[in-house]
């Protein structure tokens, strides 16, 4: 049986850790000069020893590479690779991760800030799980940031992943070619495939261990805006009314077909009966199957809907039922 675990907050000491487990940090950069030093400094201040810091730059045109080389000159753990041509953040992360030689791999963005005990807590928690991830803070400033606590059930991962910058992964898992799928965000692919390799998939630390800085130049935001320009106002009724058409449009995309066919193929075991059914419904163009998918999402809304506080009462049932349309509205995750 696959396992998902949530680790409760509790005090840890370095003496309790398995200190012989080695950790590599993998960071991908592109024109990140503004916030790069702050992130590198937070990695170097970790309470758990970092064995190597692999930074792969994707043809930056600012001073990013010069900053990286200055850190490498001062600290032998920092290894800088500069791509000959631009790969894009998905392929860049895949390429960089394959260069790690440690027991565990931690993924890092170029503009975040890590809490000093991030890696310490994750090494303690991961055990035999493929992935350990944590809550994170998100906002333009640390003081004004809010906590993000993504879902990691396989039902939730049918509709999107949790952030790569919160992940610590077993190297023997993350370096498998078959856990990296083309056409969707790499962290969504890793989260999904954690369920299809071994009995222990994902463990979750319910405490923010990094600050994900929101700013206009962050890579995921730019990717999303390249597909869907920012709306003039926050959507209210639009996902409920227009989401069905968006869902049908997404179904025609090759990346959609590959993803849900992959899930369908890997959920034939009876323990994945619910997810096998959901994948089949995601691929179907029959309007009646859409009703069944919506009903399943309503029934399992507390495991699927991103905000647990909004799953109660009549409106919670409506949100759960309409989740496939809400998910599809302005979705850019199949346009990589």
PLM regions: where:
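Short aromatic/hydrophobic "clamp" motif used to bind/position activated sugar donors
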Residues: 105
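Conserved nucleotide-sugar donor-binding catalytic segment
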Residues: 98, 153-229
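Glycine-rich, basic loop-to-helix element that forms the pyrophosphate-binding segment
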Residues: 83-100
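C-terminal subregions of glycosyltransferases and related glycan-biosynthesis enzymes
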Residues: 8, 184, 196, 200-202, ...
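Conserved donor NDP-sugar-binding/catalytic core segment of glycosyltransferases
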Residues: 117-145
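Short, well-formed alpha-helical segments that are part of the catalytic scaffolds
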Residues: 32-45
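Cell-envelope/extracellular polymer assembly enzymes that use nucleotide-activated donors
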Residues: 21-24, 52, 189, 193
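A conserved acidic beta->alpha catalytic loop
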Residues: 57-66, 85
């Amino acid at each position: 049986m696959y396992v998902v675990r949530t680790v409760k907050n509790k005090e840890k000491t370095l003496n309790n850790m398995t200190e012989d487990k080695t950790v590599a940090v993998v960071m991908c950069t592109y024109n990140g000069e503004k916030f790069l030093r702050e992130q590198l400094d937070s990695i170097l201040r970790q309470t758990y020893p970092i064995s190597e810091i692999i930074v792969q730059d994707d043809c930056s045109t600012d001073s990013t590479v010069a900053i990286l080389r200055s850190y490498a000159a001062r600290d032998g753990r920092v290894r800088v690779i500069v791509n000959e041509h631009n790969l894009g953040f998905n392929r860049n992360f895949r390429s960089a991760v394959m260069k790690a030689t440690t027991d565990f791999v931690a993924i890092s963005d170029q503009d975040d800030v890590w809490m000093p005990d991030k890696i310490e807590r994750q090494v303690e928690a991961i055990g035999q799980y493929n992935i350990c991830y944590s809550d994170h803070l998100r906002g333009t400033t640390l003081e004004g940031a809010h906590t993000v606590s993504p879902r990691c059930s396989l039902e939730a991962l049918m509709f999107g992943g949790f952030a790569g910058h919160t992940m610590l992964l077993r190297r023997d898992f993350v370096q498998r070619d078959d856990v990296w799928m083309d056409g969707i965000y790499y962290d969504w692919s890793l989260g999904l495939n954690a369920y299809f390799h071994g009995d222990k998939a994902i463990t979750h630390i319910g405490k923010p261990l990094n600050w994900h800085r929101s700013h206009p130049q962050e890579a995921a935001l730019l990717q999303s805006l390249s597909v869907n320009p920012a709306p003039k106002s926050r959507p209210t009724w639009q996902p409920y009314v227009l989401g069905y058409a968006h869902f049908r449009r997404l179904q025609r995309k090759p990346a959609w077909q590959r993803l849900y066919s992959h899930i369908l193929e890997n959920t034939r075991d009876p323990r994945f009966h619910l997810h096998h059914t959901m994948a089949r419904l995601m691929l179907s163009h029959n309007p009646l199957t859409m009703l069944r998918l919506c009903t399943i999402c309503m029934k399992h809304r507390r495991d699927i809907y991103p905000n647990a506080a909004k799953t109660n009462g009549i409106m919670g049932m409506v949100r759960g039922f309409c989740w496939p349309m809400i998910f599809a509205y302005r979705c850019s995750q199949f346009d990589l």
